[in-house]
Amino acid sequence: MPDYWANRWAVGRLRTSGHAANSISTKLRAVALLYKALPVTSDLTPRLARGEWLTVVETDHLLQQLSRRAEAVQPYGDAIAPIAPKREHKVVSLENMRSKLTTRHDEEFVDTNTKFLRTLFIREFLGWRADQHIVSLRGATKAAFAEAAAQVDAYIDDHTAKINNDPRFTNPKGLDEAQQDVLLEAINPDSPNNPWKNDRFIRVRNQLVVQLMVATGPRRGGVLGIRTSDFDPLTGRLQIVRRKDDPEDSRPVQTGNKKGACLISLDYGLIKNLKTYLVLRHKLLVHKRRQTPYLIISSKGDALEQSSINYIMRSLRAIPGLEGIHPHLLRHTWASNFVADAVAKGVDIAMIEEDLRWLGGWSKRSDMPSHYTSAYRHRSAEKRSLELQEKLVPLVNPRKPK
C-alpha cells in the first residue's frame, strides 16, 4: 500500500509486535477499505491541524460500507447509482424477481464476522493514528482531541455487532462419526469414490494432507509450511513450526504455523503413508528437475499453495455427507475427537485443555481449548439442575418412563 501512515503503522507497530506477513496484509486490506469508504482518511493531516476527527455522519457511512464486498464499497459523498430494470417483458415472474434480488444482495454483502474483523482492524489503525497526533499536543488541546477520538471509537464499538465467543454457546463441532467414515473412505487412493484424477501422486498426497489435518490437528498453513527436515523418521515425530517471513517461501500467501511450534508424534499408519508419499515426491522432483524444502508439493514440483487445499475441500464437498467440509473443520474434528476420547478415559478437563494447548499450538493464555471441552464441563451441572427441577416440580401423575 503506497501510503505513508499505513506503511508506518505496518512497519513501526505491527511488524515490531510480531505480526506475520499475512496478518499485516489482512489488516492493510481493511485500511484500504477505510480509504475507499472515507477518502479523507488517506490524508488526515489538514483535519488534524484544525483539531478535528471523524464526524458522526462519516462514521455511519463507514460502518454501512463495511458490510459490502470490497468492490461494492461506495466513497463518502458518492451517490449510489440505481440499477436500471430491463424492459424485455411486460409481465415478469414474481419468484424470478425475488430470486434475482436475493442473489444480488448475497453477492454484494459480507457476513457479520467479516464486517466485525474489518471494523476491529480499522479501529486499531484509527486509534494508533489518533495516538500519533495526540503525543504532539499539549494542555487543553490534547485533552479535547483525545476525548473526540475516544468518542468516535466508542461510537463505532456501540454500533458494531459483536461476535458471541462464549464457549457455552459457540463450541465448535467437527464431523460426526458417520461423516468421518465417508471422508476416510473417499480419500483412499484405491477407492472408487476418490474425487481426484487417477494420478497416484495426487491421490496419495491429498490423502496425506487430509489425514494430517484430521488426525493431528494442524491448520492449513501449518501443513503447507512443513519441510521434509521437520519429519524425523527415527522417532516418528513431526514439527509444525512458525517461520515468519521465510525468505525461501515464494508463495503469494506465505504459510507456516499461526502460533508457536508444536511437536506431533505420528502413529504407524501415518508414518507409512508419509514414507509412501516421500518416495513419490522424490521421483516427481527428479523427473521435473525441481527442488523445494517443503514437504507438500504440486504435480509441477512447486510448494503447494493454500488455494490448492481449498480445491481439495471443494472436491470433497461433492461427496454426499461432506457438503459442508472446509479446512478448519478438520481441525475442529481432531480437537472434538481428542476431547471425547480423553473424557471417556476419565482424564480431568483441566488436563485435557492443557494437552490441547500443547498439541494444537495454542498459547497458555488461550481459552480456545475450553470451547471444545465446554459440553463436557457443564454436563454434570446440567444433570444436577434437572434433578433439582424434578424434586421441586413434581409431576401430577408421576410415572417412570418405560
Task: Describe these PLM feature segments.
Residues E185-R220:
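Basic, Lys/Arg- and aromatic-enriched nucleic-acid-binding interface segment
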Residues D153-N188, D249-Y268, V286-R290:
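DNA breakage-rejoining catalytic core of tyrosine-based enzymes
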Residues G360-E390:
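Catalytic-site neighborhood detector that most strongly recognizes the C-terminal catalytic loop/helix
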Residues A6-S25, V31-T160, D190-K197:
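N-terminal core-binding DNA-recognition domain of tyrosine recombinases/integrases
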Residues D131-S136, M213-L238:
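Short, charged phosphate-coordinating catalytic segments
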Residues L266-E323:
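Active-site/catalytic core of tyrosine-dependent DNA strand-transfer enzymes
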Residues G225-N273:
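Conserved tyrosine-mediated DNA breakage-rejoining catalytic core shared by Y-recombinases
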Residues N194-W196, N310-W358, W362-S366:
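Short, basic (Lys/Arg/His-rich) helix/loop patches that form interaction surfaces
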